[in-house]
Amino acid sequence: MKKIMFIVMMGLSPIGFSGPVVEIYECQINKGKTLEDLSDMMNTFSAYLKKAGLSNSYKAHAGFQQIPIKPGSVNWIGISPTAEDYGKAIEWFTSSKDGQAFGELYQSVYTCQESFMTFITTSSK
């Protein structure tokens, strides 16, 4: 019985101790848009998060791809400290007027092709 409990606990430990949630979108800046438009969009996003009380639940970073170099690339990197915080951010994005307005804004600035999400389970020290 102890062996079974140990196996179950080991199997559940990554779930209980998983760290931040990271999502990455590989995007291209839309024709006629500039990095200044991207910066303005990020400022708007920060204001929306603050208004919604989500500043500590989700942080976004945007940058261009270095290797290999892709002209016009924009990578969106979103980080939430926990899965619960990520859920709060997604709920805001999909069900609030500000979230939907931001969706329209970002789609006017860039278009995304690929994305992935990961849970950080361990990190270097």
Segment roles from a protein language model:
Residues 8-10, 14-96, 108-125:
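Short S/T/G/P-rich N-terminal loop/turn motif that feeds into the first structured element of a domain
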Residues 1-4:
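Positively charged n-region of N-terminal signal peptides that target proteins for export
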Residues 102-103:
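Non-heme di-metal
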